[in-house]
Amino acid sequence: MDNAAGDQNIDNTVVAQAVAAAIDEIYDRTGQDSILVTHSQGGLPGWEVPLYTDHVAAIVAIEPGGAAAVDSDAYSAMVEQNIPVTFYYGDYIGEEFTDVPAAVMWSMMASSADTFTEAYNAAGGSSTVVHLPDEGITGNDHFMFQDLNNDVIADHIEAWIQENVTE
């Protein structure tokens, strides 16, 4: 499939529909909406999930492969459902890392999160971008949930959930 994210071996829509079906089943069993946590390229189909279910309580995007375009149907669905969104980025994001190609790419992805967040908040939504070093949490790479301080990151995400997700 060739799309805005490049040539991939996955169909983001198929993945989004499968995740939405799982979320709906969880809702049917528990009566609770789900918090969708995505990572990296898994962020791309994650943005589409609200097109297929209205049971997403929040989206936590950990260094996603870009944010939803503000002119997309996925973005509109998130705005309509008032889904709180947060983005998490570890170290090695920013202009000081221009000599590292992967860091340049992730800095561009973080920039798309800033664009999304500005538009989403202006549309009445709630979105934040968390750069862990700005929070005093350092030593994290793209797989921050595997880093030695993953408990600190989990606590930070949990605090965001407690503050932003209502039951």
Per-region residue spans from a language model:
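The feature captures the conserved acid-bearing segment of alpha/beta-hydrolase catalytic domains
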Residues: P64-L132
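Conserved alpha/beta-hydrolase fold motif
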Residues: L36-V37, I59
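Gly/Ala-rich beta-loop-alpha elbow adjacent to hydrolase catalytic centers
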Residues: V37-G46
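Active-site signature of alpha/beta-hydrolase-fold catalytic machinery across serine-
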Residues: E48-Y52
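Conserved acidic catalytic loop of the alpha/beta-hydrolase fold
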Residues: A16-S34, W160
